[in-house]
Amino acid sequence: MVKNLIFWLVITVVLMSVFQNFNSSDTSNHRVDYSTFLSEVNQDQVREAYINGRIISVTKKDSSKYITYIPINDPKLLDNLLTKNVKIVGEIPEEPSLLISIFISWFPMLLLIGVWIFFMRQMQMGGGKGAMSFGKSKARMLSEDQIQTTFADVAGCDEAKEEVSELVEYLKEPSRFQKLGGKIPKGILMVGPPGTGKTLLAKAIAGEAKVPFFTISGSDFVEMFVGVGASRVRDMFEHARKSAPCIIFIDEIDAVGRQRGAGLGGGHDEREQTLNQMLVEMDGFDGNEGVILIAATNRPDVLDPALLRPGRFDRQVIVALPDVRGRKQILKVHMRKVPLSEDVDPMIIARGTPGFSGADLANLVNEAALFAARFNNRVVSMIHFEKAKDKIMMGSERRSMVMSDFQKESTAYHEAGHVIIGRLVPDHDPAHKVTIIPRGQALGITFFLPESDILSISRQKLESQISTLYGGRLAEEIIYGSQNVSTGAFNDIKVATNLARNMVTQWGFSDKLGPLLYAEEEGEVFLGRSVAKAKHMSDETARIIDEEVKLLIEVNYNRARKILNENLDILHAMKDALIKYETIDSLQIDDLMERREVRKPKGWLEVDQKKDI
């Protein structure tokens, strides 16, 4: 930036000097022709003549001034001026040096050449952003000193760390493996849901192995020009071979490694050329000794089979969502820099966050710290973690949203219906918290929290979920009548319908159709799959599927209606508690379900006293 500024500053100064040289003559006076000047001299109208080369600055006796130019050498001019008593002032004209004359005459050409050289250098040395550097790799190389991440910073994925530890040992001591004839994997594909730590694990590998680390995103290869992607792949591997042993990390490789085929775009699009070049570089005629490729994706199903074969990606490392022990370890890592209260127990938080990824847990700790700072607390306590968890799971509170009394009551009945059905149907997750404070896009939320990590779901649990989903709509129908049911159950109906259809078509939970797969394969044409869809079922089978889905819904809908009709007193009591407290937790729900007096929420008295003051 500074060099560019200096360059243009020099150009500006030179241009100003040249134009000043061209316009150095005095142009403040108007110009007259030479014959007029001679005539005025003869008429005795001129008082003074200032001669500078061929330029004469004339001052008349009436004090007016002008300039004139001598077209040819006039030897009689001085005699005429002396005869008429004209004051003559002369000056020897300053002749420009030969170098300056040459420079002025050649300056336009030199300027064009300089500008051309400048732009060419910008194109070639513009940090990969110029037109001449389109084919250069955009991979950033991080040296061993720049990577501070180690395996100590990675938690919750012990199996994945164990899988890649051999890679680190090979990079440190390759001879130990080579003398036994062993070959280190050429490539490792890390697969897992978003936020589980795939990129972090790759950085830890490079940090532990102390080798150069090239990092690039899958979307950085392909751009608007044909052939750029393949050229960048070649350039990247060429630089990597010079730095071997080293690691190349490609994040989101599904952007460039998607399955080839006859999808939209044909078989000769730019992405496929890039993928073909990558396949050749990974396992072609030219060896890549010491160059290890690590890639990460959360869409392994869309990758090309040629990319996944042994010799290219020899290993697939699954980086799954952490279990309760893994979540505890991850929380401890992120809590290192946070001042914690004595009541904070990572295990309790880990048990209450099933399904959270490493990124979710990092966000949880950060949100808790922000809540503590907002309340001017010096340490982060469990209350802050609870508020942060509610915000992440249920969305931010919208207390500024104004709801009428009827809307509050209707929402309270709706959420109470979900809670009651969820508590009384078999094999359902316990209700953790229910609120009628608008959060996100919802007017109220009932949050069910599983007691442990869910690995598979039984048919009974699925049917219980369907019944619970319809509990809110049924509560409104029972209290206000079928004509006054609101649209608040739209999402509940959508989720319940999808569950029932999957039970029939994918999971084999239909007695009439049996354990067969009836769902049509949804091939995405942009992933190199066929545009045409084959129909895998007859019209009669499709009709039976619709009947079975409807039957599942009706059975569980009627079960939920019966449960609510038998527990109307609990429904009314829970509605009253929700309107009074706005949010109730699992302990208050227990009181309501046991038909006991509802205990007050923690801190309720303090809040109430503040309001009275």
From Swiss-Prot:
One cellular component term from this protein's GO annotations in UniProt: plasma membrane
Cofactor requirements of the protein: Zn(2+)
PROSITE patterns referenced in this protein's UniProt entry, alphabetically: AAA
SMART domains the record matches: AAA
Signal peptide: none
Record topology, Extracellular segments: 26-98
Chief place where the protein resides: membrane
CDD domains cross-referenced by the UniProt entry: RecA-like_FtsH
One Gene Ontology term from the biological process aspect of the record: proteolysis
Entry EC number(s): 3.4.24.-
Record's keyword terms, sorted: ATP-binding, Cell membrane, Hydrolase, Membrane, Metal-binding, Metalloprotease, Nucleotide-binding, Protease, Transmembrane, Transmembrane helix, Zinc
Membrane topology qualifier: Multi-pass membrane protein
InterPro entries registered for this protein in UniProt: AAA+_ATPase, AAA_lid_3, ATPase_AAA_core, ATPase_AAA_CS, FtsH, P-loop_NTPase, Pept_M41_FtsH_extracell, Peptidase_M41
Active site: E415
Cofactor note as given: Binds 1 zinc ion per subunit.
Family that this chain belongs to: In the central section; belongs to the AAA ATPase family. In the C-terminal section; belongs to the peptidase M41 family.
Complex and partners: Homohexamer.
NCBIfam families: FtsH_fam, PRK10733.1
PANTHER family reported for this sequence: ATP-DEPENDENT ZINC METALLOPROTEASE YME1L1 (PTHR23076:SF97), METALLOPROTEASE M41 FTSH (PTHR23076)
Protein name, per record: ATP-dependent zinc metalloprotease FtsH
Organism listed in the record: Buchnera aphidicola subsp. Schizaphis graminum (strain Sg)
